Amino acid sequence: MHLESIVLRNFRNYENLELEFSPSVNVFLGENAQGKTNLLEAVLMLALAKSHRTTNDKDFIMWEKEEAKMEGRIAKHGQSVPLELAITQKGKRAKVNHLEQKKLSQYVGNLNVVIFAPEDLSLVKGAPGIRRRFLNMEIGQMQPIYLHNLSEYQRILQQRNQYLKMLQMKRKVDPILLDILTEQFADVAINLTKRRADFIQKLEAYAAPIHHQISRGLETLKIEYKASITLNGDDPEVWKADLLQKMESIKQREIDRGVTLIGPHRDDSLFYINGQNVQDFGSQGQQRTTALSIKLAEIDLIHEETGEYPVLLLDDVLSELDDYRQSHLLGAIEGKVQTFVTTTSTSGIDHETLKQATTFYVEKGTVKKS
C-alpha cells in the first residue's frame, strides 16, 4: 500500500496544493513553522479522519474559508483507489471511490498509517489516556467495527454517568433504567476489553524481538494490558456474569461518586524491561527504545492483519533518536514501507534510505519537489 498523490484545499496553511509521491521515502525539508507537520497531518487525516495534534475540526480550516478538503489516491491490492475527506464547521464528509460513506467507521481502514512523532515518546511515560488513545487509533484502523463499538461504548457511558449523577443528587428517577444501562454497558465493555487485550498480546509478539535486537540482546520487553474487567476462561457469558456481579458490588460507590468506576475508559497498558516497569524505573534511553520497538511492531502487525504494509509518518522524530536508533529505524523500513519524513536538516543522518529519498522543500506554505 502507498499514497500516490494528495490534493489539499484550504487545509491549515495550504490553500491549493497538489503533490505526487514516491512509493518509497519522501522527505519534507524546511525550517520550523513552515508547514511540514501540516503535510503529515493531512496524510493522517486522510487515513484516520483524526489528527495527532488537535481534536478541534475548526483548526484544519484555513482562516475565513468554509471547509477544508483532502483528496488522495492510494495504491492498494493492485488497484488505485481515490479517497476524499471534507471538513466543515458542522463535521466531516468522507468518500471512497467517489461514494459517500455514511459513517466514518466505514471510511477508516482504507489507508493504514503508523505515525512516530516526538510526542509518541510519551506513549511509554505519559498518562494512561495517551495509551488508550493509541489503542483506539491502531485497533480502529485494522478493525473498523472497533470504532463502531467504541462510539457505542462512549454513548452508553455518558448516559450511565448522567444517570449516576442524578442518583447522587437524589433526584427521582426510574431505578430500572440503571440496570438496563449497566446491561448494555457490560456487553460493549467486554467487547472492547477483549479486542484490546488481543491486540496487546499480538503487539508484544512483534515488539519483543525488535526491542531485544535494538538493545543488543540485553533487554526483554513485556507488555501488559491492565484491564479493570477480568476475563477468566473463554466463555463470554461467564465474563458478563462476572462483570455484572462486580458492578453490582460497587453500585453504591458509583452512585456516591456519580461516575462509572470500571471499564475500558479506565484501563492502561504497562511496559516492562527485564521485569521492571519502564514507566517508573526505565531510563530515557529505555523508554525511547520501547517506543521505537512498538512503532516498528505496528508496521508488521498491520501487515499481518490487512495483508498490506502501512504508510509510515516520521514527524521530526529522527532528531530525537541517537545514531544507533536512527540507523535501526531506517534500516527496518528500507525497501518495505512508504515513508514520509519531516526534518529541518538531513546533514546529520547518514543512511542510504534518505540518500535515495524524494525531497520536497517546504517554505511558508509552498512545496517544491527537488
Curated annotation (Swiss-Prot):
- Report the principal subcellular site: cytoplasm
Sorted alphabetically, the keyword list is: ATP-binding, Cytoplasm, DNA damage, DNA repair, DNA replication, DNA-binding, Nucleotide-binding, SOS response
Which InterPro entries does UniProt cross-reference here? DNA-binding_RecF, DNA-binding_RecF_CS, P-loop_NTPase, RecF/RecN/SMC_N, RecF_2
Gene Ontology process terms (BP): DNA replication; DNA synthesis involved in DNA repair; double-strand break repair; SOS response
Q: Which Gene3D superfamilies match?
A: P-loop containing nucleotide triphosphate hydrolases, RecF/RecN/SMC, N-terminal domain
Q: What does this protein do?
A: The RecF protein is involved in DNA metabolism; it is required for DNA replication and normal SOS inducibility. RecF binds preferentially to single-stranded, linear DNA. It also seems to bind ATP.
Name-wise, this protein is DNA replication and repair protein RecF
Native source species: Listeria monocytogenes serovar 1/2a (strain ATCC BAA-679 / EGD-e)
